[in-house]
């Protein structure tokens, strides 16, 4: 399971050893919409408007207006690449990440001399300091609210108990030379910390960490109830790497930073200060969100007052394309692991695999593969679906399939839905349940059953064969042969194109 990766540069070095996993360009690119527009055609995938595809991670070495900067996009934009980076089979990601969250390895603090993230230090009280010229924060579309840091891992602690630390990825829009707006959904742990500090009239120290070991980003995307209040998600990365994540004391705020991050923004969430997200553009939009739509600009967001920026020499700014495959990987793997652990604990051996499908951005749509071994297993598929919905509240739809269906092949899933489902008996709806705030369909205008914005109808599609009819639904039994001797050049090309990620 372990891989010799401590930071983003180690991850890049690993990808460079494999075909079709990493690409660099020296062609000049504008971070304002052009970069995302380019990567849409190379590797964004996901729910990005077609045409798009899944492709390699891409480094842009020549950023217009930023001669000493480079931007990486797409590090996590492939399930196979995630498996390569975590050192496991792509089909086993849910199981392996699920093991890690149950046995976290706590982070450790190292001295500044051992922290590459502080090789360069820029203090905000310097009269020449300007976040807008220091870092090339991209926009994804021409109608974004402004430049965003899309992979800024926020790290903050409970103001009443510094031993309670949380890390999560939040939407961060550059609002001035030393200000960022921060979108914090209700109930998020850092939002709880912020509210406590604000109630006391105090700022909340925070660091924004960018350019990280992929294991850190994946672990940070776990949510309650799998990682309850007080659970430090850096422990997941520690378990995945079998080595603790290293932290370092910030240079300007009393908070820790990821020691091997490429870039760290240090600052304070100010009490009682709010800003309109699109105050400089008046676009009405924020940025592309994972469902595939441009989210609305928030009229009132908390503000981070930047105190310092630290970075490595020749630092890499890491970003993603909002609704792309990268979001599916980052959000989806913790979703899958949470479902796996919950169902396996309640019905051991029944769930064979789980996939948080790209169409749902890793959050809305879960495909559960189950295996009925005896008559008593009939009905347990519904129990598994309910457990999944309970373990991950942001799920909207569950599709249940048998063990002979490839859950990573949408054609196979639709085949099961077409030939093994009858709408009048195979669909269970659960209306009136709180959904994810970014689902644009959960409004009273969309459905008369919805009493208020944010309420959704959860749906279970049972595409499994009833136990009593199993013998009538066996797939055509083709001969099991090795085709490679018949077309060696074709299979050599195929294996080369697939790389060594699987």
What are these regions (language model features)?
Residues 1-303, 307-502:
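Extended, highly charged
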């Amino acid at each position: 399971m372990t891989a010799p990766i401590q930071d983003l540069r180690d991850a890049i070095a690993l990808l460079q050893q494999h075909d079709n996993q990493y690409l660099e360009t020296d062609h000049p690119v504008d971070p304002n919409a052009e970069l995302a527009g380019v990567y849409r055609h190379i590797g964004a995938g996901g729910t990005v408007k077609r045409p798009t595809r899944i492709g390699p991670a891409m480094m842009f070495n020549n950023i217009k207006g930023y001669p000493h900067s480079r931007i990486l996009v797409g590090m996590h934009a492939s399930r196979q690449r995630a498996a390569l980076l975590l050192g496991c089979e792509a089909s086993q990601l849910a199981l392996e990440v699920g093991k890690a969250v149950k046995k976290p390895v706590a982070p450790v603090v190292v001295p500044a001399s051992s922290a590459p993230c502080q090789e360069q230090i820029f203090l905000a009280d310097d009269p020449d300091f300007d976040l807008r010229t220091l870092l090339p924060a991209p926009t994804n579309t021409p109608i974004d609210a402004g430049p965003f840091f899309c992979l800024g891992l926020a790290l903050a602690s409970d103001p009443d108990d510094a031993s309670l630390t949380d890390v999560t990825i939040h939407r961060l829009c550059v609002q001035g030379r030393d200000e960022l707006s921060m979108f914090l959904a209700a109930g998020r742990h850092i939002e709880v910390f912020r509210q406590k500090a604000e109630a006391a009239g105090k700022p909340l120290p925070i660091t924004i960490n960018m350019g990280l070991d992929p294991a850190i980003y994946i672990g940070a995307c776990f949510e309650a109830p799998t990682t309850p209040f007080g659970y430090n998600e850096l422990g997941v990365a520690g378990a995945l790497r079998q080595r603790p994540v290293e932290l370092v004391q910030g240079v300007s705020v009393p908070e820790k930073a990821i020691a091997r991050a490429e870039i760290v923004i240090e600052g304070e969430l100010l009490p009682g200060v709010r800003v309109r997200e699109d105050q400089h553009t008046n676009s009405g939009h924020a940025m592309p969100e994972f469902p595939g739509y441009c989210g609305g600009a928030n009229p009132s967001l908390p503000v981070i007052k930047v105190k310092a920026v630290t970075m490595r020499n020749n630092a890499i700014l890491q970003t993603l394309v909002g609704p792309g495959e990268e979001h599916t990987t980052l959000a989806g793997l913790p979703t899958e692991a949470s479902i796996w652990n919950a169902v396996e604990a309640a019905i051991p051996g029944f769930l064979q695999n789980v996939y948080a499908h790209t169409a749902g951005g890793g959050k809305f749509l879960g495909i559960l593969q189950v295996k009925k071994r005896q008559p008593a297993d009939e009905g347990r598929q519904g129990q598994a679906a309910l457990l999944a919905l309970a373990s991950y509240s942001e799920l909207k739809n569950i599709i249940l399939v048998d063990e002979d269906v490839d859950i990573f092949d949408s054609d196979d899933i639709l085949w099961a839905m077409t030939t093994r489902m009858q709408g009048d008996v195979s669909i269970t709806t659960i209306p009136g349940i709180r959904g994810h705030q970014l689902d644009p369909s959960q409004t009273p205008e969309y459905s008369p059953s919805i009493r208020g914005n944010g309420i959704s109808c959860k749906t279970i599609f049972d595409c499994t064969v009833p136990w009593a009819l199993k013998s009538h639904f066996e797939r055509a039994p083709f001969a099991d042969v090795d085709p490679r001797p018949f077309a060696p050049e074709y299979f050599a090309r195929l294996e080369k194109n697939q790389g060594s990620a699987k």
